[in-house]
Design a protein with these regions (language model features):
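Conserved AMP-binding/adenylate-forming core of the ANL superfamily
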Residues: 2-7, 12, 20-73, 90-95, ...
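Conserved pre-ATP/AMP-binding loop-to-beta segment of ANL
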Residues: 4, 19, 134, 152-175, ...
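Conserved AMP-binding A3 loop
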Residues: 32-35, 171-195
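Structural core segment of the AMP-binding/adenylate-forming
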Residues: 49-50, 77-146
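Conserved S/T- and glycine-rich ATP-binding loop of Class I adenylate-forming
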Residues: 58, 75, 106, 170, ...
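Conserved AMP-binding
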Residues: 62-65, 86-88, 206, 216-220
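Short hydrophobic alpha-helices that are characteristic scaffold elements of the AMP-binding
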Residues: 73-78, 99-100, 220, 229-233
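Conserved AMP-binding/adenylation subdomain of ANL enzymes
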Residues: 194-211, 219-250
């Protein structure tokens, strides 16, 4: 693998070299690598249009959907830092991380597994949180389409932001489980976040000929890095599953 070890650079390269190859397949929507890059750039423009600057933290609190993949890559393309949140967090637990990271944008889930945790957030206790975008899951309660229809920045600005990202820039902050105390945010650079899954994929002999069913949650290192970022670098087709369902998986 050659070129800059940043998520935007890898996506650009894969969109060029594997343009018509399936990158992401779900029951709702599918993308080739070229289509995925186009969607990521449009979403990054919408993110930047909300006033999100390079270096800002953007949280994703949602299960495995195509929106998660697009949002993740778009956050990086906009020069921002991804903060994944566990879908089983209570609103109080999620709020603690949102407060500590001072995230101005949360891309969250609509009603999921009978609960609406995003609606339970105490916005008054989160002064930095200016925007919430809801991904529709169990009902028609999402705001993703409205978010995408909003006024974004020009794609030329998005491309400039993506090109400005460097390998040693922070790409994500993943919080520990807090088994022995308060959870701690672990900062990883683009170089780190891409190198580890590339090595893992090489050991597992993952190639563009593979179709990768990802049941592991994207909010965890396994689903995010050994899933999304491994597929991104190898050309394997990512097939995410919302929650584990043996019959559906088979």
């Amino acid at each position: 693998m050659t070129g800059q070890l940043t998520t935007p650079a890898v996506l650009d390269r894969m969109a060029r070299d594997f343009a018509d190859h399936d990158a992401l397949v779900t029951a709702d929507r599918s993308f080739t690598f070229a289509e995925l890059r186009d969607e990521v750039r449009r979403t990054a423009a919408a993110i930047a249009g909300l006033g999100i600057d390079p270096g800002d933290r953007v949280a994703i609190w949602s299960p495995n959907t195509w929106h998660w993949v697009v949002a993740c890559l778009s956050i990086h393309y906009a020069g921002a830092i991804l903060v994944p949140l566990n879908t089983r967090y209570t609103a109080t637990e999620a709020a603690d991380i949102l407060l500590r990271t001072e995230a101005p944008l949360l891309i969250g889930m609509g009603r999921f597994l009978g609960a609406d945790r995003v609606a339970d957030l105490d916005r008054d206790a989160l002064p930095a949180l200016r925007h919430i975008v809801r991904i529709p899951l169990d009902g028609d309660d999402g705001t993703w389409d409205e978010f995408m229809a909003g006024v974004g920045v020009p794609l030329s600005e998005v491309d400039a932001r993506g090109a400005a990202v460097r390998p040693d820039d922070v790409s994500d902050i993943l919080f520990t489980s807090g088994t022995t105390g308060r959870s701690k945010g672990v900062l990883c650079s683009h170089r780190q976040s891409l190198s580890a899954p590339a090595a893992w994929a090489a050991c597992g002999q993952v190639t563009a000929a593979d179709r990768y069913l990802c049941i592991n949650p994207f909010f965890h290192n396994f689903g995010y890095k050994a899933g999304i970022l491994a597929c991104l670098q190898t050309g394997a087709t990512l097939i995410p599953q919302l929650t584990f369902d043996p019959e559906q998986a088979m």
